[in-house]
UniProtKB/Swiss-Prot annotation:
This is Golgi pH regulator. GO terms for cellular component: Golgi cisterna membrane; Golgi membrane; monoatomic ion channel complex. It catalyses: iodide(out) = iodide(in); chloride(in) = chloride(out); bromide(in) = bromide(out); fluoride(in) = fluoride(out). It is found in: Golgi apparatus membrane. Keywords: Glycoprotein, Golgi apparatus, Ion channel, Ion transport, Membrane, Protein transport, Transmembrane, Transmembrane helix, Transport, Voltage-gated channel. The chain crosses the membrane at residues 46-66, 79-99, 111-131, 150-170, 290-310, 343-363, 378-398, 425-445. It is a multi-pass membrane protein. The lineage of its organism: Eukaryota, Metazoa, Chordata, Craniata, Vertebrata. Voltage-gated channel that enables the transfer of anions such as iodide, chloride, bromide and fluoride which may function in counter-ion conductance and participates in Golgi acidification. It comes from Salmo salar.
């Protein structure tokens, strides 16, 4: 009876997560597009629901909610479903919709979709060759073989996002990095934009007038010269056509310039708004957070470097280790085990909420940046793939943030994986991503004032 009640609780929560994923799809991702393929919406919502359920099971593990056998069953069931979706369903539909957008392959799109899926499976399986994740004890389609490969991709994505976020967050929040933008700078750039638009309009008028004159001149020549005039018009280009192509090239160059000026104007407006916002109480609060994140970023880069150089992986979770160091330093009586469990629960909860929120915000921005009416279905499925792999990898890495007694069932469910490898791999990619982001933001920050100083 208890297993049935536990299953009802899990099923109800999955329905709620599915509904939230459905609403997010409709209200955020597809609010500017017509939903033509409901299978995309269903696949995205299922991926979101089972991804969130894994985090729910981690919280239940710490709280001791549900029966141990029930939690183990739902861990296994959840992992098999999410792996089925990530390895079989989503890649197949990505291939199907990519092929559907190619006219030459319309008649055999199911066949070519299968070809795309088999290609994905080949490279997905070959991914295990250069990494120490394979285990000869398990079969080809065992859960360990699948999770290990999904984990490599997901941990790489997590490390890239974390490295960029650790650098970009203080850069975004701190007023120290803001350029000094005045109203006169914006007005000067807007004036240049308007002048460019006027030049485009005048040149397009010239093109229209020239084409009209060429058309009228051609009509007159056909009426006057008859058959020989037609032969001449075919063998020779009409007068003014060379000048017309030259003007069209100038228009194309001016339109590209106008696009750049428009983007620079929007950038200056946003910077000016950020300067005004930084003077408010909330802006000063985020400025303080920026300094805090700067210290965190430096510490994280330093620790990642230490872990890589000395091949080090923590044995205990950070909370327990931090409390032990503090208690030993202060020399006070303190129940480390009791409080580490509660603080770990709060920390894991914060990590879960911020991970889901941060990923959804990133996915929304990415979708609006590159989507179109034709590619939107493919992009949503790619985002679902990224989201699922990201959350599976979060469970792999979050295991280290849990006290030792709560790791056992997670370790048992995930199988005999090389957990230390994933932590070292995360440190390597995080360090590369963070240092690359520092270099990129430094060059962008240095180049921006020079760009706006040009007359």
């Amino acid at each position: 009876m208890s297993f049935l009640m536990d299953s009802v609780i899990m099923f109800t929560s999955q329905v709620l997560f599915f509904g939230f994923g459905w609403l997010f799809f409709m209200r955020q991702l597809f609010k500017d597009y017509e939903v033509r393929q409901y299978v995309v919406q269903v696949v995205f919502s299922i991926t979101f629901a089972f991804s969130c359920t894994m985090f729910e099971l981690i919280i239940f593990e710490i709280l001791g909610a549900l029966e141990t056998s029930s939690r183990y069953f739902h861990w296994k069931f959840n992992l098999y479903v999410i792996l089925l979706v990530l390895i079989f369903v989503v890649p197949f539909y990505i291939g199907y919709f990519v092929v559907s957008n190619i006219r030459l392959l319309q008649r055999q799109k199911l066949l070519f979709a299968c070809v795309v899926w088999f290609t994905f499976m080949y490279f997905f399986w070959k991914l295990g060759d250069p990494f120490p994740i394979l285990s000869p004890k398990h079969g080809i389609l065992s859960i360990e073989q699948l999770i290990s490969r999904v984990g490599v991709i997901g941990v790489t994505l997590m490390a890239l996002l974390s490295g960029f976020g650790a650098v970009n967050c203080p850069y975004t929040y701190m007023s120290y990095f803001l350029r000094n933008v005045t109203e006169s700078d914006i007005l000067a750039l807007e004036r240049r934009l308007l002048q460019t638009m006027d030049m485009i309009v005048s040149k397009k008028k010239r093109i229209a007038m020239t084409r009209r004159q060429m058309y009228q001149r051609g009509e007159d020549q056909n009426k006057q010269t008859g058959f020989w005039g037609m032969i001449k018009s075919v063998t020779s280009s009409p007068p003014g056509s060379e000048n017309l192509s030259l003007i069209q090239q100038e228009v194309d160059a001016l339109e590209e310039l106008s696009r750049q000026l428009f983007l620079e104007t929007v950038d200056l407006q946003a910077t000016k708004e950020r300067i005004e916002y930084s003077k408010t109480f909330q802006g000063k609060y985020f400025n303080f957070l920026g300094y805090f994140f700067s210290i965190y970023c430096v510490w994280k880069i330093f620790m990642a470097t230490i872990n890589i150089v000395f091949d080090r992986v923590g044995k205990t979770d950070p909370v327990t280790r931090g409390i032990e160091i503090t208690v030993n330093y202060l020399g006070i009586q303190f129940d480390v085990k009791f409080w580490s469990q509660h603080i770990s629960f709060i920390l894991v909860g914060i990590i879960i909420v911020t991970s889901i929120r941060g990923l959804l915000i990133t996915l929304t921005k990415f979708f609006y940046a590159i989507s179109s009416s034709k590619s939107s279905n493919v992009i949503v499925l790619v985002l679902a793939q990224i989201m699922g792999m990201y959350f599976v990898s979060s469970v792999l890495l979050m295991r280290m943030s849990m006290p030792l007694e709560y790791r056992s069932i997670v370790t048992e469910v995930l199988g005999e994986l090389q957990f230390n490898f994933y932590h070292r791999w995360f440190d390597v990619i995080f360090l590369v991503s963070a240092l690359s982001s520092i270099l990129f933001l430094y060059l962008a920050h240095k180049q921006a004032p020079e760009k706006h100083m040009t007359p």
